A protein has these predicted regions:
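RNA substrate-binding interface of SAM-dependent RNA methyltransferases
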Residues: 1-14, 52-149
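N-terminal positively charged helical leader segments and presequences
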Residues: 1-56
Length: 179
């Protein structure tokens, strides 16, 4: 198992050590030999790909940014809602986030099959890159303005914070507006 973890790290593959009980639950009683691999059901795209999609449509970018959404059902619901709202894509962090899996696809009602999702190493740096491309960053926060009081036009990146804690401090500090 140590070798598998070392090789995964060398290849930039995320891994997580869990308890035997967790492995048993994940394998649903099947033999796991102490290791379970989980892969994405779809390929991720780059941030540039999402910006290009908006550009090709001659539209201002509308991007949903997920800050540590860990529950796959919630990520699927966000993707479904983003697609229905006309977003050009969704951004998720590589760490501390649900990934594209069967649960996300099912909950998204198929939207995860066609709405591009970018998985980034550094969410804060990605937000900076969006700002450099003229995108205004709106964060969802209990202390923000009501979205009905704001004219949401132009290039928009909308941040949705984690289930338990909302946006992290660094991410919140990067917002141009709070809703």
């Amino acid at each position: 198992i140590t070798l598998i973890c070392r090789l995964a790290k060398e290849k930039g593959i995320n891994y997580k050590r869990v308890t035997e009980t967790k492995l048993n639950n994940m394998s649903r009683g099947a033999s796991h030999q102490g290791v379970i691999a989980m892969g994405a059901c779809a390929e991720y795209v780059s941030l540039e790909d999402i910006l290009s999609i908006a550009n090709e449509k001659e539209e201002d970018p509308f991007i949903i940014i997920c800050d540590e959404i860990e529950e796959p059902h919630n990520l699927g619901a966000i993707i479904r809602t983003a697609e229905a709202a006309g977003a050009h894509g969704v951004i998720i962090p590589k760490r501390r986030s649900a990934s594209l899996n069967a649960t996300v696809f099912k909950t998204s009602a198929g939207a995860a099959s066609w709405l591009p999702v970018a998985r980034v190493s550094n969410l804060a740096a990605t937000i900076d890159m969006l700002k450099e491309n003229g995108v205004w960053i709106y964060g969802t926060d209990g202390e923000g303005q009501s979205y009905t009081e704001v004219k949401l036009t132009g290039p928009i990146g909308l941040i949705v914070g984690s289930e338990g804690f909302g946006m992290g401090r660094l991410i919140k500090d990067k917002c141009d507006f709070l809703l």
